[in-house]
Amino acid sequence: HAEDKILMVDLDMIPVIEKLIGSCPKIAQVIILTDRKNMPETALKNILCYEDLLSEQSGNFEWISGDEREACGICYTSGTTGNPKGVTYTHRSNVLHALTVTNPDMLNLSSNDKVMPVVPLFHANGWSVGYSAPLSGSSLILPGREMTPQALYEMLETGVTITLAVPT
C-alpha cells in the first residue's frame, strides 16, 4: 500500500526478500547494505550495493533546507491495536522525541549509560534510541537477530544500564 519503488535490504534478509520480491511489483531497485566484494550470490535482479554507491560520491554534500513538519520516515505497525498501517514521522517529532527521552523524568540518558533496545526498530522505542543515545553520549548496544535468552543475557552482562522493551 506504500507503493515503494526502492527497497534497502540487510544481508541477513536477502533469502526472505528473494521469496517475497515477486509479490512486490512496484519495487524497481533493490539496494543491499554491503559492498560488491562482500555481496553473496542472489537471485535478486537489478541490485546495487549501498557502500559502493557511497564511495562513488564526492563527499561535498550540499544540505537542502526543508520544513521540520515534513515527513522524514514511515514505519509500519503490525496491527497490535488495530489494522496494520503506515505511520509517518516528521523531522520535528523525531527531534522532540529524542530530546524527551534524554530528560530526567524519562530515561535520563547520559554518557555513563549503555542502552540496549530489544524492540523492533520500527517501534517508537527502537527508532528513537538511535537518535537519543548519540545525543546523550550513551553507548548503543544493538542485539541484532540473536534474541535468544542466552545471547540477551550475555549482552546485558557487558554493563547495559537501560533496556527498552515492550510489556506484551
Feature annotation, model-predicted:
Residues H1-D52:
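Structural core segment of the AMP-binding/adenylate-forming
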Residues M8, I47-L48, S65, T88, ...:
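Short aromatic/basic micro-patch
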